[in-house]
Amino acid sequence: MSLIVYFSSRSENTHRFVQRLGLPAVRIPLNEREHLRVDEPYILIVPSYGGGGTAGAVPRQAIRFLNDVHNRQLIRGVIAAGNRNFGDGWGRAGDVIAQKCAVPYLYRFELMGTPDDINTVRKGVSEFWQRQPQNV
């Protein structure tokens, strides 16, 4: 049990980060008409949009994915990408999703992340799943 579900825009920053993690992962489609349904618990990784406020921070595709009750019931945590140029609002999508889905905001990284971010997330995700009840 260690699935990563992620959304990445055409910039591919989040996609490159997830690829470097080397963990099992599925991507939420860019095309909003395509639907993804998952059948196991997962950690969601999303970029943050907008200027640091909550309105528009979460990508529409991620909202649509989480509006599926089945998918929403399986989220266990969130990691957000952002840009420090937005000050305190960087990585805001993680705050929004953590609050609305009642899951922990596990980590945030800037743009494509650094090698330290990759190592921290890889280790943190492994430890997170080890702490989860096996029947979830």
Swiss-Prot record:
GO MF: FMN binding
Pfam families: Flavodoxin_NdrI
GO biological process: protein modification process
Domain of life: Bacteria
PANTHER family for the chain: PROTEIN NRDI (PTHR37297:SF1)
Family: Belongs to the NrdI family.
Function summary: Probably involved in ribonucleotide reductase function.
Name of the protein this chain belongs to: Protein NrdI
Organism for this UniProt entry: Klebsiella pneumoniae subsp. pneumoniae (strain ATCC 700721 / MGH 78578)
Lineage of source species: Bacteria, Pseudomonadati, Pseudomonadota, Gammaproteobacteria, Enterobacterales
Gene assigned in the entry: nrdI
